Amino acid sequence: MLSVELHAHSSLSYDGRDAVEKLLARAADAGLDALAVTDHDEIAASLRAVELAPEYGLLGIPGMEVTSAAGHVLALGVDEQIPDGLPFGTTLDRIHEQDGVVVVPHPFQESRSGVMANISRAELAQADAIEVYNSRLLTGRANRQARTFAREHGVPQTAGSDAHISEMVGRAVTLVETDERSVPSILGAIRDGRTHIEGRRTPWHISFRQAAGGAKRKFRERLASLLE
């Protein structure tokens, strides 16, 4: 059984704070086996984390959080950046073309780009897995909805800290039923549904601070682009 963090952001995300080195150090301190850095519409930091992970005694899983036209989609096991803004189904196809795994994070949280505001339940069931525990959700309702949906439709389940600062890495993890510490083995277990969920909610004041900081950074970046 391996303990895996499948949802974490570095400073390459507009709302992330820390370099991948800090995320890796925290993952090692938390006793994790593997970490996927999943920045918003960027893959460079994730690929860097894959290179550095062995220095921390970890396995790095390449990935990113893609902003599809419907909302957020985690692409795990991909080596090339998936374009943002594509339709939900096309985004899934692009991920699968790289033999990647599609995990839909916080699907019922509309305020945080959850896809269920824009797709059908049949479309959501096409995902390889659904994130049924996201530690940044302020209430448990959206997580419960995700878990109920996954159970009713037989979709594999994952958890993710959705960490935007290093201290929150490992807050919610996916326990994967495999003894082989490799990306293909972990992703294969997720596809097969050989997973268990462990998680604790991110303190609300940290979630609010992260959200506010991300909004300010995004505003500054947009303003800078307008002034160029």
Language model features: what each stretch is:
Residues M1-L6, S10-Y14, D18-V20, A25, ...:
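Charged catalytic cores and adjacent phosphate/nucleic-acid-binding surfaces used
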Residues L23-D41, G100-V103:
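Divalent metal-dependent hydrolysis catalytic cores, especially in the metallo-beta-lactamase
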Residues T38, H106, S161:
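Short beta-strand/turn micro-motifs composed of small residues
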Residues G57-L58, D99-V101:
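Loop/turn elements at helix/coil->beta-strand transitions in domains of secreted/extracellular proteins
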Residues V103-S111:
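Aromatic-lined carbohydrate-recognition surfaces of secreted/lumenal glycan-active proteins
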